[in-house]
Amino acid sequence: MRINPTTSGSEVSAVEKKNLGRIVKIIGPVLDVAFPPGKMPNIYNALVVQGRDNEQTNVTCEVQQLLGNNRVRAVAMSDTDGLMRGMEVIDTGAPISVPVGGSTLGRIFNVLGQPVDNLGPVNTNTTSPIHKSAPAFIQLDTKLSIFETGIKVVDLLPPYRRGGKIGLFGGXGVGKTLLIMELINNIAKAHGGLSVFGGVGERTREGNDLYLEMKESGVINEENIPESKVALVYGQMNEPPGARMRVGLTALTMAEYFRDVNEQDVLLFIDNIFRFVQAGSEVSALLGRMPSAVGYQPTLSTEMGSLQERITSTKEGSITSIQAVYVPADDLTDPAPATTFAHLDATTVLSRGLAAKGIYPAVDPLDSTSTMLQPRIVGEEHYETAQRVKQTLQRYKELQDIIAILGLDELSEEDRLTVARARKIERFLSQPFFVAEVFTGSPGKYVGLAETIRGFQLILSGELDGLPEQAFYLVGNIDEATAKAMNLKT
């Protein structure tokens, strides 16, 4: 018999005596289980399938529906291979619970909180259920402050809020995961902050790359694992929909403990929140619910709200969440990204057009927004610089049709100057990443906010009009651009 990893043996044996059901139907990852009259488990309770003839099984399920006639419908958190009708099922009497606290740092977990990194069991008895209420209104902290990332385009145009929710929007292959990896790297090095990474329905290869990158950069300390700065929770593409639907909650539960009990500021990375919605859609169809717009589940807003409302700042500490959002067919009006938009403080939109030009990070400076870009929060200097950068880029965008038809020579002198500066700004928004050193051959750069503002002010003022635009491509601060220009001239 397999014991739920978050329930001790004595508790299981006590439950075993009073609440045992049997599988009556299996449809893929969905099980129907019959229980004795009056002993129905609650919604979200964890059920453990008991193997026949003392054979161990590895299947934990979560109750999703009460069907009547003493039957429940549950969704499996792992493959249901080998399960048969008539197998006994134990009601654990509680939701899935996962280990929390400092012992989780430097480790990789699955949706059930079991370590999957071959480094032995987790040294903690402290567990927490993955289903909880959001903090009460009175507990929330409403202070506004900027979260510096060291990435120029992000810090200048859609600045991130400490304790806020940020969405990285983009189609396939524009650099969402790479940007998340760079943010984890920069934040661990510059701020020494703790991070929890939730890999929700993404490529296993990317999860492996992230783990190896963490070890190389020292975010995961191989010599002394408890000194690590990140906990990783994976429910990747090959997992059943139940695991992909709940792995985000597992990561969030670990982050909540650091916030509420350790009173720390913690970062929660979710890659990819669209896969959370997609898994919910699969589960909804398997449970027989009528689909809503574009085939999504009718409970889309509720499911998204129950996750997002728990990601917040309280008087004890904060959770700053950065979520990659895959945009199907680059359509921002799709219900999944559109529902996510409502919860975010900042949106960083990644553009395929910029990626095609080789400008990385491919953050669209005009589409990306932030509620923090206000003079009373970021200061007049930052606000004015950001607005002038946007105006210059917007004017360049308006002129592109004329340039394509008539050429640059037909523009006025003022417009030609605007185009030249906009092209320099566009290239200066690119930046070499630490986590992409292997691909680019350029060492990564962390650029402070003051340096970023100074650089763009110099371009806008016209002081650097004489420098070639390629000098601004893939550099850190403005001094590197001027040095690169000198090298290009010689």
Swiss-Prot record:
Its EC number is 7.1.2.2. It is a peripheral membrane protein. It catalyses: ATP + H2O + 4 H(+)(in) = ADP + phosphate + 5 H(+)(out). GO terms for cellular component: chloroplast thylakoid membrane; mitochondrion; proton-transporting ATP synthase complex. It comes from the Eukaryota. The keyword Cell wall biogenesis/degradation does not apply. One of its GO terms (molecular function) is proton-transporting ATP synthase activity, rotational mechanism. Produces ATP from ADP in the presence of a proton gradient across the membrane. The catalytic sites are hosted primarily by the beta subunits. This is ATP synthase subunit beta, chloroplastic. It comes from Ipomoea coccinea (Scarlet morning-glory).
